[in-house]
């Protein structure tokens, strides 16, 4: 499918009739009819100046509110339907496992100490984690996907790119608003609305926005017999946002925004794709855990690389667990923006924000109906302050534009996780040890050697961190000669973090007892007994034996760093509709502290290094045929050093830096409007994002060396989007419309590792680490086959869009795909590990009614 998609994408360059970024409606007033072509632009602030997206010399996908509406985009994850270089995936946690990627680059989540490589900014305020920004998309003025490192102007952690989201401003002139209501599959009900009220005409206004959405889960939860006991991956959330905006005759303008969102959605269930040979070989049955090893799914592959059955398991939409996951999230914040003119050509702008994010989650962490290992409570409190002050203006009769400023953020993290071993934990240990011992240890090996049943073992691990970031920055653009503009920018950033891991409650007798019984356990089995008797998530910390054995240790660590981030860019306007540019950017993403129980095992340093990137880009932006056709091209090469990686092995989260990773490719965005009624758009990203063969540098770590030569996760070689919009007036007051779009994705990897990293025995047998890696088997169920995703929406609009009724279907062909595939917890090892995956949403359909006033 990759070759087919590459042909599609290459055809974009040859066929201007199917090329360019979707035509934008005027973002100032989405209620008005389509304006004349000369006004058919999106004004963006990607350079911290309001400019036509076609005039700025950077790669940015600008999405209008009408485009969001036509595609039914409800949150940041669904922006991928409109931007081929952007992808999103989600793993287990509602609060912290969303991964955003731009140009194939992103930071794997599930560790609260990790920050995203894609920065998210809402109304100019930095959102410290993607999960914080997952609330409902409603009353949005525009979304900008800034591709490539953006750290010079956009604050923190934008080594891959940024999402710049702007909500609709309060209008000081008009009373207006809207109400939308939808009903769809899985009993989904959604209501959105906003009202804008001028308080002091032309000076002060209040805008209140709200949204509520509820939907049943699209995955059934079954017990070990296959009986349905519930569902998961549902939606139950609401949002309220109030905005006070002012605009005075003196030029002072600003707004104060307060928002609160609540989510009680169940997220997220994992489908077992491949069943461990320990199950099919009878080890689980031999210890009394049943022929299916506690997995009640009716479909699961039992032979490696059975792609057909992997797909059938996904299509079956069933997960096996003791109970459906529970999440309860409160998210609220305040953002203030003040623009103060200090002269006719310069403004002082302040943006400050405070946000508090609190969550409670409870889930079955072994992903089967066996009672092995649960997270009884995961409680997170995330508090963030940000402040930015900018002086920006122009000089030299408009040839000079500048931005100077300073930025500060202060973040505190407090996460407590209560883990518990279940009533069948020891039997699961018996199954894991059945093959190497020939079943000689019976069904309960831990109790056999210690006299203690591990059931009920529990503890509470607490992770805390405080982080401060400071920076000063400047960006200057100067028109050297007519049409030729040079831009130079720099930011100097300081990062400080202080955090660690402690235990606040421990009820664990099995670990000390296991260590005390090591003298009675055969030497070959001792590492397994240590790992299972002192399971990393539930083991007591700082036991005396931790000085010589790989046991959990508490830690308190500090991280500090500083970096100069800089960019140079030159752009030339051949004529009004054609602009070319070339740029170089040195970007940065701060390192930090691995907030995990195993981070300091063996005296390891729990910190990880900062990530840096050098990015080169050339591009052209053009409009022609009286602005009926738009065609943008961008070619890029990005080289990352100390690329940050987090991997879940099935028993622990490993955090490390890979010395080198690269992303290069070509991006195409295009649109054509042959008539006032028809608009076609097409875009594509042709990508090569990978760890090069020499990615390890001087590192000898197996986890690093085993990545070299493989593609990055969720980095499809080709993603192409084709769409169209037909708006046909039927009478003076009635308009028919039909909107359709298809997103094509080639094959892509869904795991961190592409092979099964060799252990000490394999390395010794092979004679070297590299020889063992070369001989290692591919990891099972890593590659997701290429797919297509088709969205359609049609309906009638009345009275110039004042009222509308619409029908929609998303994912028409019902392709259920996986974004993340991983080793199932405590269910085998190496090539004998079970493999599970988190799936994305299936086909949905429904109706929407809209009213504007």
Question: How should each PLM-predicted stretch be described?
Answer:
Residues 337-341, 347-363, 573-596, 607-666, ...:
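Membrane-embedded beta-barrel scaffold of Gram-negative outer-membrane proteins
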Residues 245-247, 391, 401, 405-409, ...:
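Structural signature of Gram-negative outer-membrane beta-barrels, strongest in the C-terminal barrel
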Residues 1-81, 251, 334, 340, ...:
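N-terminal Sec signal peptide and the immediately downstream disordered periplasmic leader
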Residues 27, 402-405, 482-486, 630, ...:
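Gram-negative outer-membrane beta-barrel transporters
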Residues 164, 173-174, 180-182, 198-293, ...:
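Periplasmic-side early beta-strands and strand-to-turn transitions of outer-membrane beta-barrels
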Residues 426, 743-762, 796-853:
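C-terminal beta-signal and adjacent terminal beta-strands/loops
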Residues 35-174, 618:
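Acidic, small-polar-rich N-terminal luminal/periplasmic segments of exported/outer-membrane proteins
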Residues 115-117, 129, 138-147, 152-240, ...:
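Outer-membrane beta-barrel translocator/receptor signature
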């Amino acid at each position: 499918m990759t070759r087919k998609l590459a042909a599609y994408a290459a055809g974009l360059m040859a066929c201007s009739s199917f090329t360019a970024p979707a035509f934008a409606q005027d973002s100032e007033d989405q209620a008005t009819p389509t304006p004349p072509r000369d006004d058919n632009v999106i004004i963006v602030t990607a350079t911290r100046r309001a400019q036509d997206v076609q005039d700025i010399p950077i790669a940015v996908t600008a999405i209008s509110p009408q485009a969001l509406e036509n595609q039914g985009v409800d949150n940041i994850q669904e922006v991928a339907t409109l931007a081929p270089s952007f992808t999103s995936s989600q793993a287990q946690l509602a609060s912290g496992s969303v991964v955003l990627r731009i140009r194939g680059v992103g930071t794997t989540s599930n560790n609260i100490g990790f920050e995203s490589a894609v920065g998210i900014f809402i109304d100019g305020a930095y959102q410290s984690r993607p999960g914080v920004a997952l609330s409902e998309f409603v009353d949005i003025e525009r979304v900008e996907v800034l591709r490539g490192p953006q750290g010079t102007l956009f604050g923190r952690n934008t080594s891959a790119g940024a999402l710049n989201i702007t909500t609709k401003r309060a209008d000081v002139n008009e009373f207006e608003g809207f109400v939308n209501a939808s009903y769809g599959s899985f009993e989904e009900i959604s209501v959105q609305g906003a009202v804008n009220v001028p308080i002091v005409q032309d000076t002060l206004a209040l805008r209140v926005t709200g949204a509520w959405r509820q939907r049943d889960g699209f995955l059934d939860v079954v017990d070990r017999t296959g009986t349905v006991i519930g569902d998961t991956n549902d939606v139950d959330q609401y949002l309220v946002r109030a905005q006070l905006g002012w605009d005075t005759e003196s030029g002072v303008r600003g707004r104060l925004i307060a928002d609160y969102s609540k989510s009680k959605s169940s997220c997220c269930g994992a489908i077992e794709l491949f069943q461990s040979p320990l199950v099919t070989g009878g080890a689980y049955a031999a210890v009394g855990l049943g022929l299916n090893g506690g997995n009640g799914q009716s479909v699961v592959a039992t032979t490696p690389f059975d792609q057909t059955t992997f797909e059938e398991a996904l299509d079956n939409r069933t997960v096996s667990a003791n109970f459906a996951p529970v999440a309860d999230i409160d998210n609220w914040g305040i953002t203030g923006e003040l623009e103060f003119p200090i002269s006719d050509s310069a403004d002082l702008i302040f943006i400050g924000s405070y946000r508090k994010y609190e969550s409670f989650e409870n889930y079955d962490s072994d992903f089967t109906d066996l009672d092995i290992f649960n997270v009884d409570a995961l409680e997170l409190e995330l508090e963030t302050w940000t402040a930015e002050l900018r002086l920006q203006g122009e000089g030299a009769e408009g040839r000079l534009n500048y931005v100077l400023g300073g930025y500060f953020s202060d973040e505190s993290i407090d996460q407590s996780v209560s883990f518990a071993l279940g009533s069948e934990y020891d039997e699961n240990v018996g199954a894991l040890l059945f093959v190497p011992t020939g079943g000689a240890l019976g069904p309960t090996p831990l109790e056999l050697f210690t006299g203690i049943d591990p059931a009920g073992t529990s503890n509470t691990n607490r992770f805390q961190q405080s982080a401060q970031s400071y920076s000063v920055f400047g960006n200057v653009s100067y028109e050297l000669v007519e049409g030729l503009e040079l831009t130079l920018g720099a930011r100097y950033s300081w990062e400080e973090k202080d955090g660690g891991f402690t235990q606040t409650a421990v009820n664990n007798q099995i670990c000390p007892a296991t260590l005390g019984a090591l003298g009675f356990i055969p030497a070959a089995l001792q590492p397994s007994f240590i790992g299972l008797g002192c399971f990393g998530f539930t083991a007591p910390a700082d036991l005396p034996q931790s000085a010589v054995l790989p046991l959990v240790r508490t830690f308190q660590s500090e991280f500090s760093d500083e970096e100069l981030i800089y960019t140079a860019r030159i752009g030339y306007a051949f004529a009004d509709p054609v602009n070319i540019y070339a740029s170089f950017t040195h970007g940065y993403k701060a390192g930090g502290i691995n907030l995990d129980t195993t981070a300091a095992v063996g005296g390891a340093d729990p910190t990880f290094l900062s990530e840096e990137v050098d990015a080169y880009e050339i591009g052209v932006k053009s409009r022609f045929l009286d602005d009926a056709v738009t065609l943008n091209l961008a070619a890029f090469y990005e080289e990352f050093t100390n690329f940050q990686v987090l991997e879940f092995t099935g028993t622990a989260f490993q955090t490390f830096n890979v010395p080198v990773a690269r992303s290069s490719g070509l991006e195409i965005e295009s649109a054509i409007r042959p008539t006032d009624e028809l608009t076609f758009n097409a875009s594509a990203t042709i990508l090569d994002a990978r760890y090069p063969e020499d990615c390890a540098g001087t590192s000898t770590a197996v986890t690093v060396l085993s990545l070299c030569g493989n593609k990055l996760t969720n980095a499809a070689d080709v993603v192409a989007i084709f769409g169209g919009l037909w708006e046909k007036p039927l009478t003076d007051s009635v308009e028919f419309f039909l909107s359709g779009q298809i997103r094509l994705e080639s094959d892509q990897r869904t795991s961190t590792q592409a092979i099964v990293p060799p252990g000490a025995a394999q390395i010794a047998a092979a004679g070297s680490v590299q020889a063992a890696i070369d001989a290692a088997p591919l990891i099972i169920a890593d590659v997701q086959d290429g797919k297509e995703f088709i969205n359609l929406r049609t309906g009638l609009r009345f009275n110039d869009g004042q009222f509308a009724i619409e029908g929609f279907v998303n994912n028409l062909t019902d392709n259920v795909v996986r974004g993340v595939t991983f080793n199932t917890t405590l269910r085998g090892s190496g090539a004998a590990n079970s493999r599970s995956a988190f799936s994305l949403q299936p086909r949905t359909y429904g109706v929407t009614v809209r009213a504007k006033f």
